[in-house]
C-alpha cells in the first residue's frame, strides 16, 4: 500500500509552496488507494509559533485535504533516543557535549534514483560532514526524526522540494546504518516568488488562509499556475 506524509513544521503559516507539496502527496495516496499522514515536525522548539498547528489543519481542511493519521514528533522523543543509542552501540554515532553526532563514512558514494526524472543522484561520502542527530535538549534533528518516522510509519514515497536533495544522502546513510530499506524519493521543483527565489515563511510568503479570507475559492489553489498543479 502507498503511504505518504506531509510533514510541515509549526513555525509559521502554510503557504502555497507547502500546499503544493501536500497536494502531490495527497493525490498520490488517493489515486493509488493509499494513505496520507499529516505529521507535525515540531522538534525545533525555539521556533514554534502558537496556533500554527491549528492553522495548518484549517488550511488543509479548506482545501478538502483529509488525513488518515495524525502524528506529532515531540510526542516520540523516547523513540528517537532509543535509535540514537542503537547507532552509538553500532559505532555509527558518538556522544559529543551532550549531543549525538552521526559518523559519516569517508570513502565511497551515496546514491539514489530520484523518481522525478528517473535520474541518479550521487554524493561523495568524503564531502558529507558528520552531523548532529540528537541535540543537547533531547530533541532529534530533522535528519534523525525524518528517517525514524518514515521507517516506523512505513512511508513508501517521500515527496518533497528539491531543496532537500543535499540532505537526502544523510538520510540514506542513516537507513543503511540501521539496516532499513529507504523509501522512494521524489524531489519536486520549488515554487518560486516573483523574485525568482523559493517561497518561504521567513521571506513573507502569503498564508493560504489569507486567500480564504479574501473570498477566493479553494479550487483556485489546484489550478493556479503558481502551484503548477
Regions found by a protein language model. Give the residues of each.
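N-terminal Rossmann-like or analogous alpha/beta NTP/dinucleotide-binding catalytic cores
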Residues: 1-99, 126, 166-178
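Non-catalytic terminal extensions that flank enzyme cores
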Residues: 1-13, 34, 186, 197-199, ...
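Glycine-centered secondary-structure boundary/capping sites
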Residues: 62-64, 154, 179, 215, ...
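Short acidic (Asp/Glu) and glycine-rich catalytic loops that position anionic groups and cofactors
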Residues: 63-64, 151-154, 199-204, 220-226
Amino acid at each position: 500500500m502507498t503511504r505518504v506524509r506531509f510533514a510541515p513544521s509549526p513555525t509559521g503559516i502554510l503557504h502555497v509552496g507547502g500546499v503544493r507539496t501536500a497536494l502531490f502527496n495527497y493525490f498520490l495516496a488517493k489515486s493509488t488507494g493509499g494513505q496520507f499522514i499529516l505529521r507535525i515536525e515540531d522538534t525545533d522548539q525555539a521556533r514554534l509559533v502558537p496556533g500554527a498547528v491549528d492553522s495548518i489543519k484549517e488550511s488543509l481542511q479548506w482545501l478538502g485535504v483529509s488525513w488518515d493519521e495524525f502524528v506529532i514528533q515531540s510526542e516520540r522523543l523516547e523513540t528517537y533516543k532509543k535509535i540514537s543509542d542503537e547507532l552509538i552501540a553500532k559505532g555509527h554515532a558518538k556522544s559529543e557535549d551532550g549531543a549525538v553526532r552521526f559518523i559519516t563514512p569517508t570513502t565511497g558514494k551515496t546514491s539514489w534514483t530520484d523518481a522525478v526524472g528517473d535520474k541518479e543522484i550521487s554524493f561523495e561520502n568524503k564531502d558529507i560532514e558528520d552531523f548532529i542527530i540528537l541535540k543537547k535538549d533531547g530533541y532529534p534533528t530533522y535528519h534523525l526524526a525524518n528517517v525514524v518516522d518514515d521507517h516506523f510509519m512505513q512511508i513508501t514515497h517521500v515527496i518533497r522540494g528539491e531543496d532537500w536533495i543535499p540532505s537526502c544522502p544523510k538520510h540514506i546513510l542513516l537507513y543503511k546504518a540501521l539496516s532499513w530499506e529507504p523509501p522512494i524519493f521524489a524531489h519536486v521543483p520549488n515554487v518560486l516568488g516573483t523574485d525568482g527565489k523559493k517561497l518561504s515563511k521567513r521571506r513573507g510568503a502569503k498564508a493560504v488562509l489569507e486567500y480564504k479570507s479574501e473570498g477566493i475559492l479553494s479550487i483556485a489553489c489546484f489550478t493556479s499556475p503558481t502551484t503548477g498543479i
